[in-house]
């Protein structure tokens, strides 16, 4: 069987979502590890006054492509930016571009999607479902297409606790929903959305389930594969450890925790944190397309790209490693010392929200007003709480994903491909990965230099001293207000102090006797 780089040699690849987190990592990996690929057609829309070519050039000039630039300085020649709007009829392709794509494309990677959990249902259906259907219809016209690779999500069927590598029946017929949305106004769409999505937490998950069904039904005559990643995080190894460029998912929470803004989150310590590195998702997508292209299986291949069943990690462990990393390597100008409390208790959660989030933010905004600056902390806390609401479903529940197809795919790889396109998450060392992830948010999202660590540590020590001083003043105030005025309170206080003194004396005496 040919190797993965040999399979992609001379192939023309069509990629959607190349300006997104996953898409740009896939583009970099494809060009670096399969250098003899012929060309990559990238569907990109105009945005903010930038042409598709300018947007692609901006992506290619980023740090992500540093390694590729060193190894292959001429890689840009293989990338062809094509003006396309996935939300428009026929993808808004010109006749000339459409003809080129139809005649040349061998492999499609469909990575584009709206990943906003609070997206309006109409918009989510447009990009995640209708655009997928239009791409399938375009693929059916392609003369030399070998594989259609669709990137979905492991949570598409999160209404099930055990999820196999199959496409399940959709919650509603996608065609009927699309037809209904055409005559509904936005108010009606918003009103019926909660009932439509049912026990799924948001429109993103709901529409990704519909998209899988569209791929299965509309692409029945195509050679289709689906990769379902869970929570996509920073890179594990490639192109370098810890690369991340956005605040989405856990990244924003990690940063908020490192800044000392996030103090509590509704989560179960024992719930599985099914994080999967972005380079694992990319490697699996490239390998899955290779397998389907070489073997042409009869049925659609689905791969649950998850970690929980083979290398389990829990949210309590995530919290520990994130906080310990940011205490050793603090973010600049932290608001408070990093410390996060996980709780699944509703009342306790809202208590900590009031005491640890809203009260300090309110007091800090008063301080900003008094010093002539614009208050901002309450706005930050409000945005943080909205993000927490969307994520708490995933931090409070656990699922079991079948990974038989993933194991089969791993066994099909030759020794060299197993190294180059590593998908074996059993090798993932979580403590090291989380540390690199946190450092990645510092370096690549916040653009903080590691040379600034001494100053950041000094600032963290200053915050510690402020906290100690505040606690001391608080104890004195409590003493003056409550204990000093009550004989019973004083007696209890003296008893506790005496007990502590006796315990310490006993401890010192025991230590002396041992030596």
Swiss-Prot record:
GO cellular component, one term: peroxisomal membrane
Swiss-Prot/TrEMBL induction comment: Down-regulated by ether lipids/plasmalogen that induce its degradation (at protein level).
Entry EC number(s): 1.2.1.84
Side of membrane Peroxisomal, spans: 484-515
Ranges in a coiled coil: none
Chemical reaction(s) catalysed: a long-chain fatty acyl-CoA + 2 NADPH + 2 H(+) = a long-chain primary fatty alcohol + 2 NADP(+) + CoA; hexadecanoyl-CoA + 2 NADPH + 2 H(+) = hexadecan-1-ol + 2 NADP(+) + CoA; octadecanoyl-CoA + 2 NADPH + 2 H(+) = octadecan-1-ol + 2 NADP(+) + CoA; eicosanoyl-CoA + 2 NADPH + 2 H(+) = eicosan-1-ol + 2 NADP(+) + CoA
One Pfam family recorded for the sequence: Sterile
SUPFAM superfamilies per UniProt: NAD(P)-binding Rossmann-fold domains (SSF51735)
Membrane topology, Cytoplasmic segments: 1-465
Chief location bin: membrane
Variant or mutagenesis effect after changing residue 480 to C: In CSPSD; increased ether lipid biosynthetic process in patient cells; increased FAR1 protein levels in patient cells due to impaired down-regulation by plasmalogen
An example Gene Ontology molecular-function term: alcohol-forming very long-chain fatty acyl-CoA reductase activity
Keyword field: Cataract, Disease variant, Epilepsy, Intellectual disability, Lipid biosynthesis, Lipid metabolism, Membrane, NADP, Oxidoreductase, Peroxisome, Transmembrane, Transmembrane helix
GO biological process: ether lipid biosynthetic process; glycerophospholipid biosynthetic process; long-chain fatty-acyl-CoA metabolic process; wax biosynthetic process
Compartment annotation: Peroxisome membrane
Necessary and sufficient for PEX19-mediated localization into peroxisome membrane: region residues: 451-507
Record field: transmembrane: 466-483
Bilayer topology annotation: Single-pass membrane protein
Role: Catalyzes the reduction of saturated and unsaturated C16 or C18 fatty acyl-CoA to fatty alcohols. It plays an essential role in the production of ether lipids/plasmalogens which synthesis requires fatty alcohols. In parallel, it is also required for wax monoesters production since fatty alcohols also constitute a substrate for their synthesis.
Disease: Peroxisomal fatty acyl-CoA reductase 1 disorder: An autosomal recessive metabolic disorder clinically characterized by severe intellectual disability, early-onset epilepsy, microcephaly, congenital cataracts, growth retardation, and spasticity.
Subunit-structure text: Interacts with PEX19; PEX19 mediates the targeting of FAR1 to peroxisomes.
Name assigned to this protein: Fatty acyl-CoA reductase 1
Higher taxonomy: Eukaryota, Metazoa, Chordata, Craniata, Vertebrata
